[in-house]
Amino acid sequence: MYVVSTKQMLNNAQRGGYAVPAFNIHNLETMQVVVETAANLHAPVIIAGTPGTFTHAGTENLLALVSAMAKQYHHPLAIHLDHHTKFDDIAQNLRSGVRSVMIDASHLPFAQNISRVKEVVDFCHRFDVSVEAELGQLGGQEDDVQVNEADAFYTNPAQAREFAEATGIDSLAVAIGTAHGMYASAPVLDFSRLENIRQWVNLPLVLHGASGLSTKDIQQTIKLGICKINVATELKNAFSQALKNYLTAHPEATDPRDYLQSAKSAMRDVVSKVIADCGCEGRA
């Protein structure tokens, strides 16, 4: 009942003029932070995981946790495959119960990207599974994939329309100047490009690489059509730095129930801020 499709979430966001945050989690504690914070704020959220996370934690384990927490907190949740690239991997996760997928073929030439994505869409839609794909490519590192800045490229607005129509995707991830990881200096986002994409494509648009973006930039992208905001690195950094600080100050600590609390608290602050930036509090 409480594990829902991202398609309905994002369509609601598009109509309501806000964005749904997708938080990348890795284990029980990081999932607890996201779900507890979202439930307290009555905010829709997406629980996202890269291929590495699903391998690390196990698909069935993650699904069981999401289902149990959704029921415990009486809060709708979606679980999402983030930056998955292999058809067999996606199909296996769907058979386990995942109902939202990002197929990332953005590294391929345009025609091959369309072909790969359409294959996944045709399969997923048979099971009422929503599909996100990316046109353009972000720089930085996501999981084990490293894209050099020189190889990154922005989304072409006219191609975006052709891509959306040819593939039948439910949401489109765009490249407008963000990158995976944290920024050494503030990025300059191409808002005019985003506005142009919005004029060509009526699907919910997705922004990857949002860790470290200013509130002003996030809210401007939402005004121009972004309906899903992905955050990963900022969560990991907050969690790990707080944990390091605690263990440095308390070298005698051995109980994870104690030393993980400061890490969870630091991550909770980031989740709360992103929810506020997305304008989705009270929208669940």
UniProtKB/Swiss-Prot annotation:
GO cellular component: cytosol
Cofactor binding note from Swiss-Prot or TrEMBL: Binds 1 zinc ion per subunit.
NCBIfam families recorded: cbbA, PRK09195.1, PRK12737.1, tag_bisphos_ald
CDD domains: TBP_aldolase_IIB
Any Pfam family: F_bP_aldolase
Name of the featured protein: D-tagatose-1,6-bisphosphate aldolase subunit GatY
EC number(s) recorded for this UniProt protein: 4.1.2.40
Induction entry: Constitutively expressed.
Active site positions, chain numbering: 82
Reported function: Catalytic subunit of the tagatose-1,6-bisphosphate aldolase GatYZ, which catalyzes the reversible aldol condensation of dihydroxyacetone phosphate (DHAP or glycerone-phosphate) with glyceraldehyde 3-phosphate (G3P) to produce tagatose 1,6-bisphosphate (TBP). Requires GatZ subunit for full activity and stability. Is involved in the catabolism of galactitol.
Reaction(s) catalysed (UniProt annotation): D-tagatofuranose 1,6-bisphosphate = D-glyceraldehyde 3-phosphate + dihydroxyacetone phosphate
Superkingdom classification of source: Bacteria
Binding site for dihydroxyacetone phosphate: 181, 209-211, 230-233
Subunit comment: Forms a complex with GatZ.
Pathway: Carbohydrate metabolism; D-tagatose 6-phosphate degradation; D-glyceraldehyde 3-phosphate and glycerone phosphate from D-tagatose 6-phosphate: step 2/2
Sites where the protein binds Zn(2+): 83, 180, 208
Matches recorded under Gene3D superfamilies: Aldolase class I
Family per record: Belongs to the class II fructose-bisphosphate aldolase family. TagBP aldolase GatY subfamily.
HAMAP family for the chain: TagBP_aldolase_GatY
Keyword Zinc: yes
Gene Ontology MF, one: tagatose-bisphosphate aldolase activity
Family matches, as InterPro entries: Aldolase_TIM (IPR013785), Class_II_FBP_aldolase (IPR050246), FBA_II (IPR000771), TagBP_ald_KbaY/GatY (IPR011288), TagBP_aldolase_GatY (IPR023955)
Keyword RNA-binding among UniProt keywords: no
Cofactor (UniProt): Zn(2+)
SUPFAM superfamilies reported for this sequence: Aldolase
GO BP, sorted A to Z: D-tagatose 6-phosphate catabolic process; galactitol catabolic process
